[in-house]
């Protein structure tokens, strides 16, 4: 189960990167804190235990994403995904239309929070919003009824543009926003 969650998250992040930057046949590096990896596996591994867990990824992942090299410095883990992995995601998975549209919208000059909320509502009428006053973000939006998208999307209006970051539910809870 944990490896399935890890695989899906790696693919989700690669899709998001491709929506933001375009598709390139190149290696990429994705970084995770130990706490996020422990959430995937419902574990409380220390860094050495997690490194051992990740040193031999299952064939179900490597057959798709290639021979991923995992290393860490402190509690920050780096997943070095070979170009075969980015090509696989591009060629063999459906694009995430919502992420593509969100990236396009927030990249537009003059984008508003209302436009972002309207975009969410085009994908579901069951959307949860929460105003945030933590200095980091202004608004949380998430889908209440989309098991394929459990992310918490946090937005910050920086005056001239809006930025966002998406968190897995457990990671969002860890931040204690």
Show where each model-derived region lies.
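Short helix/turn-capping signatures at newly exposed starts of structured segments
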Residues: 92-126, 167, 173-176
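Positively charged, polyanion-binding regions of nucleic-acid-associated proteins
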Residues: 2-29, 102-104
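Intrinsically disordered, low-complexity regulatory segments enriched in Ser/Thr/Pro
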Residues: 147-177
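Alpha-helix boundary/N-cap detector
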Residues: 1-9, 32, 45, 49-52, ...
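Charge-enriched amphipathic alpha-helical scaffolds
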Residues: 28, 38-69
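Charged low-complexity interaction tracts in eukaryotic proteins
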Residues: 60-92, 162
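A cross-family detector of function-defining hotspots
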Residues: 112-155
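Short glycine-rich, basic-tinged beta-strand/loop micro-motifs
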Residues: 23-44, 96-106
